[in-house]
């Protein structure tokens, strides 16, 4: 938890409480349904929570922003972002029902009010969003195909509506394959831990 407060110094008491609740909630649910690798559970705050919040260092969502988290797994990046941005609306979707069960239990246990969940596929979602977030669920080109028609044309954030994608390594080939403008932000510009040396946020504008 200290690592979150190290990089996000203006958390409200409620946010501190919610972030603080995540370790025990994930530890409990991970024993029933494995959503975080066993070796990572002790590094939950660095490798999952803070990693998710890397998106917040690139884009601070304004109140009323609608965000879709595709392939959320156990709730990353959606749950940490929903705590940090309580006035934005988050829709977390995954095709595996037991993972959505964990998301629902963790968000309820932490008292998070601005999340809704769907057990299903991104292609079947009919709503419109300002941003789609995800954490390395597939290559950019197929991912774009899943979400290209999900974007609202209502623009009011500092970045253009689009994808904010957490990925690592050399992405040149994937971005070339995507054949759309894409902007890379190295997370080691914001976080000093070695884990983030090769981690990035990629912004793919929708329009």
UniProtKB/Swiss-Prot annotation:
Keywords: Cytoplasm, Methyltransferase, rRNA processing, S-adenosyl-L-methionine, Transferase
Sites where the protein binds S-adenosyl-L-methionine: 71, 76, 122-123, 135
Molecular-function GO terms, alphabetical: rRNA (guanine-N7-)-methyltransferase activity
GO cellular component: cytosol
Keyword rRNA processing: yes
Enzyme Commission number, as recorded: 2.1.1.-
Disulphide bridges: none
InterPro entries: rRNA_ssu_MeTfrase_G, SAM-dependent_MTases_sf
Compartments it resides in: Cytoplasm
Primary location: cytoplasm
Similarity section: Belongs to the methyltransferase superfamily. RNA methyltransferase RsmG family.
HAMAP family xrefs: 16SrRNA_methyltr_G
Function: Specifically methylates the N7 position of a guanine in 16S rRNA.
NCBIfam families: rsmG_gidB
Protein name, as recorded: Ribosomal RNA small subunit methyltransferase G
């Amino acid at each position: 938890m200290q690592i979150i407060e190290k990089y996000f110094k203006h958390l409200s008491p409620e946010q501190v409480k919610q972030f603080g609740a995540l370790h025990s909630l994930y530890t409990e649910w991970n024993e029933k349904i494995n959503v975080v690798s066993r070796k990572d559970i002790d590094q939950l705050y660095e490798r999952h929570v803070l990693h998710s919040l890397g998106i917040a260092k690139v884009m601070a969502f304004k109140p009323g922003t609608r965000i879709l988290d595709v392939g959320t797994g156990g709730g990353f990046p959606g749950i940490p972002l929903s705590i940090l941005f309580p006035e934005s609306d988050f829709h977390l979707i995954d095709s595996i029902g037991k993972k959505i069960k964990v998301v629902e239990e963790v968000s309820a246990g932490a008292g998070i009010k601005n999340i809704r969940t769907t057990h299903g596929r991104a292609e079947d979602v009919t709503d419109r969003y300002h941003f789609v977030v995800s954490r390395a669920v597939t290559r950019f080109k197929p991912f774009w195909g899943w979400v290209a028609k999900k974007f609202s044309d209502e623009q009011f954030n500092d970045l253009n509506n689009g994808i904010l994608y957490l990925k690592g390594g050399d992405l040149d080939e994937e971005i070339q394959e995507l054949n759309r403008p894409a902007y890379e932000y190295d997370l080691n510009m914001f976080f000093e831990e070695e884990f983030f040396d090769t981690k990035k946020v990629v912004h793919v504008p929708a329009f």
